A protein has these predicted regions:
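Formylglycine-dependent sulfatase
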Residues: 2-3, 15, 20-406, 412-453
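Sec-dependent signal peptide recognition
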Residues: 7-15
Length: 453
């Protein structure tokens, strides 16, 4: 049975809080860790220094990565924004979360990371882009994050408004308020305030930046740093310089957040995870900047495809004393793993009734265990696209528009150029059969007595 009554979660809070506190003490902490999830928007795997970018600098992210673990095989759950975010919020595949397209709502009965951690005594906040569906059924607004476990919210509920990098208004809780400034600066300011107000409760802070989603824009002083450094098709509109400036400003704002954690003496017991919701886009609103800069290098594809460039994303995690500094994780990390991993960090476990697909990877990041042997799945059948994918170990199966299954060794062939299906017929057949069986688990009707859609 799915837990679908918010009162059930609140009623369980006292018991769960005791359990969480005991778990944290057993792990050597008197206080459960603060947890910070930083999500970039359409940032390519190759856009950050810790993955080899040299044309611009990301010193704060690189420093964080050096103090923790770089997740070399980190995968988003989807190739576009809303399905990806719903998946990591719930720990579920897109076919189980109820959000498979950009215009779908997160079902109200789904338990999010914020709800799960709040029931464990955490204060929760989301600052940034929510993007969990357009209004439906006569509602005036999309499903609100404060109805899904967040105590505080500041940002966009309407994803199309996130195209505006200098917004005139944002949502502060449920109110629309006037604002002025560059969006990622505003979000960081609010995060600094939240961290500064931290009291006795541990907190879960999710900050979903707008960089580097189109339309691209950045503060003039950042753009000037890169003007003339790239071969622009139109020097009067330095799109590549602007893209580099967006990523630089993103890194600068993350540095501000880390500095505030340090100032408050919180960094030593804070788990920080950084990633992107999907790969970089080569679409027209981006002006071709990501394509010219090869943001997804060395991978094939982009946002809205299930090639590595669409779903393999930058990732790193830092938790001093728990995650060894300077480590690299070559195990597969899927963003549906965040919910169970965060709960484990808080000293708790996932309620089986939530039917979470992800697994706790904290022992893997701590180098206490190998990654689980599992097959992971993706589907993208919307907006004129039709692609399916499955990964097990080094191998990835891709099926495009119902065509012949293609098999790639994405460790030795990360660009997915050499189809080895013919030389691995049994594995190709097994993965294709598993993919078909997975699709049959789609949740399209009533679950736990509730009509999910």
């Amino acid at each position: 049975m799915i837990i679908n009554d918010r009162r059930c979660l609140r009623a369980a809070g006292a018991f769960v809080l005791v359990f969480a506190a005991c778990g944290s003490i057993a792990l050597g902490y008197e206080h459960p860790p603060d947890i910070v999830l930083i999500v970039a928007d359409d940032l390519g795997w190759g856009d950050v220094g810790f993955n080899g970018r040299t044309e611009w600098s990301t010193p704060n992210l690189d420093r964080l990565a050096g103090q923790g673990v770089v997740l070399k095989r980190c995968y988003s759950a989807a190739t576009v924004c809303a399905p990806s975010r719903a998946a990591f919020l719930t720990g579920k595949y897109t076919i189980h979360s109820g959000v498979r397209r950009n215009d779908e709502d997160l079902p109200a009965e789904e338990v999010t990371i914020a709800e799960a951690l709040r029931s464990h005594g955490y204060a929760t906040a989301l600052f940034g882009k929510w993007h969990q569906g357009k209004p439906r059924g006569g509602r005036a607004l999309p499903v609100h994050p404060m109805d899904q476990g967040f105590d505080e919210f500041f940002g966009y509920t309407d994803a199309t408004k996130a195209w505006e990098k200098y917004p005139k208004t944002l949502r502060d809780g449920r109110r629309e308020v006037a604002v002025s400034g560059y969006i990622d600066d505003l979000l960081t300011d609010r995060a600094l305030d939240f961290v500064g107000r931290r009291q006795e409760k541990p907190f879960f802070l999710e900050i979903t930046y707008v960089a580097s989603h189109f339309h691209i824009a950045a503060p003039a002083e950042e753009v000037e740093r890169y003007r003339g450094k790239f071969r622009e098709s139109d020097p009067a509109r330095p799109l590549q310089a602007t893209y580099a400036a967006m990523v630089t400003r993103l890194d600068r704002n993350i540095g501000r957040l880390i500095a505030r954690l340090d100032e408050r003496g919180l960094a030593a017991n804070t788990l920080i995870v950084f990633t992107s919701d999907n790969g970089a886009t080569f679409e027209k609103g981006n002006g071709g900047a990501s394509s010219a800069l090869d943001s997804n290098r060395p991978f094939r594809g982009q946002k809205r495809t299930l090639w590595e460039g669409g779903i393999r994303v930058p990732g790193m995690a830092r938790w001093p004393g728990r995650i060894p500094a300077g480590s690299v994780c070559a195990e597969i990390v899927h963003l549906i793993d965040l919910l169970p991993t965060f709960l484990a960090a808080a000293g708790a476990t996932v309620d089986p009734s939530w039917h979470v697909d992800g697994v706790n990877l904290l022992p893997v990041w701590e180098r206490q265990a190998r990654g689980p042997q599992r097959t992971l799945f993706w589907e993208w059948q919307s907006e004129g696209y039709d692609q399916l994918a499955a990964i097990r170990g080094d191998f990835k199966l891709v099926v495009t528009r119902g065509g012949k299954p293609e098999l790639y060794n994405v460790v030795t062939d990360p660009e997915e150029r050499r189809d080895v299906a013919a030389s691995h017929p049994d594995l190709t057949r097994q993965l294709n059969d598993e993919l078909k069986a997975w699709l049959e688990t789609e949740v399209a009707g009533p679950v736990g007595g509730l009509d999910r859609r």
